[in-house]
Amino acid sequence: MKVCIISILGRPNVGKSSLLNKIIKYDLAIVSNVPQTTRDQIMGVYTEDGYQFVFVDTPGIHKPLNLLGESLNKEAFSSLKDIDCVLFLSPVNEDIKSGDKLILERITNAKNKIAVISKIDLAKSPDEIAKKIDGLKEYGFNKIISVSNKNDKSVDSLIEILKEYAYNAPPFYDEDYITDKSMRFMAKEYIRESAINLLTDELPHSIAVEVQDFIEEDDRITINAIIYVKKDSQKGILIGKGASMIKKIGTNARMKMSHQFDTKVTLNLKVKVSNKWINDKSALKKFGYN
């Protein structure tokens, strides 16, 4: 077996989670158009044709405005320990920004690093892709490639390139192993994903989810969870008129869990206010953001 441990880095909302899901062919990392959707370091394992790649998806690196932001950056940079290759993602339609430069400084001495130009379906012309490639050349990447999550061939090309950095070693995990995250963790994330994709403005950044009970039975899983917000006004928005919004959130999350877990799911949601959770160390620890 040939193996390689790969860290996926980039600013918020550059396509890291979408790429991981496409590679491992499983909705592991939640996806939305809201920056900083990923809050945890998530490991996804690809095993095929005598190769095993362990991918580490990270929170988007940004200038932190609170303790949660500091925790997310710390989580992202911790992924650089004991890795064999770095994938640095940057969208084709965006210039290199201060957040990118922060990451590029941290990976200056990485032995193997690949620049991945993401969202190439948004490119207006081949010249735009060429300009992006030129802008990345000064940072010492081993390779610069472009990827579209809508194009399987471009993802296959990335896998072929990564094989160049794999080495002979016993596999880290069994062939059917996908992630180190538990079903309980995934339930929390699917609830948060459902809420994020239905809510607007700053509210998605203000929510946290706690799974209180995760009960596995022969024919179903029963989940009791709490969605926390920072303000009473946000609680009203999250619940909605006649509980319409919380019902939508619950229905969407339950349907995804039932599909991903391959069993019936009963989901019970409550909404509570925790005014300062985003800047409270004990609250962050409670929600899994150490």
From Swiss-Prot:
The organism sits in which domain of life?
Bacteria
UniProt keywords, alphabetically: Cell membrane, Cytoplasm, GTP-binding, Membrane, Nucleotide-binding, Ribosome biogenesis, RNA-binding, rRNA-binding
The protein's location, in the record's own words, is: Cytoplasm; Cell membrane
Q: Where is this region: G2?
A: 36-40
Q: A Gene Ontology molecular-function term?
A: ribosomal small subunit binding
Segments for region (G3): 57-60
What would be one Gene Ontology cellular-component term for the protein?
plasma membrane
Region G4, as annotated, extends over 118-121
Q: Where is this region: G5?
A: 147-149
Q: Is tRNA processing among the key words of this record?
A: no
Annotated spans, G1: 10-17
Note whether Heme occurs among the keywords: no
What the record says about family reads: Belongs to the TRAFAC class TrmE-Era-EngA-EngB-Septin-like GTPase superfamily. Era GTPase family.
HAMAP family assigned to the protein according to its UniProt record, in alphabetical order: GTPase_Era (MF_00367)
Give the function comment from the record: An essential GTPase that binds both GDP and GTP, with rapid nucleotide exchange. Plays a role in 16S rRNA processing and 30S ribosomal subunit biogenesis and possibly also in cell cycle regulation and energy metabolism.
Task: State the protein's name.
Answer: GTPase Era
The record lists the organism as Mycoplasmopsis agalactiae (strain NCTC 10123 / CIP 59.7 / PG2)
Q: What's the source species' lineage? A: Bacteria, Bacillati, Mycoplasmatota, Mycoplasmoidales, Metamycoplasmataceae
